[in-house]
């Protein structure tokens, strides 16, 4: 059950980050709206907020980590791919209870559902490089 509720929390965090980037609205307004419309018993609000607010508060650090491993500039990445990468990098660096293989798998699944045809390959490539070269050397 934990994996299902966390998966849904990731999905909601992705949607909230996407809305935040496009609308430039106050991030708390967006999180409140997401919580209000998700009238689902298994919605892990705590994990959603951890991801969503955590990404927003650490976005500069996450960008710094991500940029050297991108095959194109940050502004050339669409909002979905960017949001998926931000969530995954936040989980990799801040959520020690989530194995990195789970983070990669969840990011790829989100990219397959919401991204373009090749988004999941791009996400996998970037995360693989960051994990092997930066986060989990040796």
UniProtKB/Swiss-Prot annotation:
Cited SUPFAM superfamilies: NusB-like (SSF48013)
UniProt keyword terms in alphabetical order: RNA-binding, Transcription, Transcription antitermination, Transcription regulation
Matches recorded under Pfam families: NusB
Top-level taxon: Bacteria
GO biological process, one term: transcription antitermination
InterPro entries in alphabetical order: NusB-like_sf, NusB_fam, NusB_RsmB_TIM44
GO MF: RNA binding
GO cellular component, one term: cytosol
HAMAP family: NusB
PANTHER family: ANTITERMINATION NUSB DOMAIN-CONTAINING PROTEIN, N UTILIZATION SUBSTANCE PROTEIN B-RELATED
NCBIfam families listed in its UniProt record: nusB (TIGR01951)
Task performed by this protein: Involved in transcription antitermination. Required for transcription of ribosomal RNA (rRNA) genes. Binds specifically to the boxA antiterminator sequence of the ribosomal RNA (rrn) operons.
Family statement: Belongs to the NusB family.
Protein name as it appears in the record: Transcription antitermination protein NusB
Species annotation: Blochmanniella floridana
